[in-house]
């Protein structure tokens, strides 16, 4: 009995032909029932602080 890897079966089960409407959406066209993507306001990234040997807050970390 020949066995096929699990992920190969999973991938094969997930593939199917796209409909005309789905092709239109993936190609960047306008599909009638698809709502437009809302713009997300840009927010700056939070920076992570790393502790140093003698921190400004008075904590001393062992070297």
UniProtKB/Swiss-Prot annotation:
Region ranges (Disordered): 23-63
Location of Pyrrolidone carboxylic acid modifications: 43
Keywords carried by this UniProt record: Protease inhibitor, Pyrrolidone carboxylic acid, Serine protease inhibitor, Signal
Presence of the UniProt keyword Signal in the record: yes
Database matches in InterPro entries: Prot_inh_I10_marinostatin
Signal sequence coordinates: 1-29
One Pfam family in the UniProt entry: Inhibitor_I10
Residues carrying the site annotation Reactive bond: 48-49
Molecular function terms, GO-annotated: serine-type endopeptidase inhibitor activity
Transmembrane segments: none
Listed Acidic residues bias regions: 53-63
UniProt biased composition (Low complexity): 32-44
Family named by the database record: Belongs to the protease inhibitor I10 family.
Function field: Inhibits subtilisin, chymotrypsin, and elastase, but not trypsin.
Protein name: Marinostatin-L
Organism of this sequence: Alteromonas sp. (strain B-10-31)
UniProt gene name: mstI
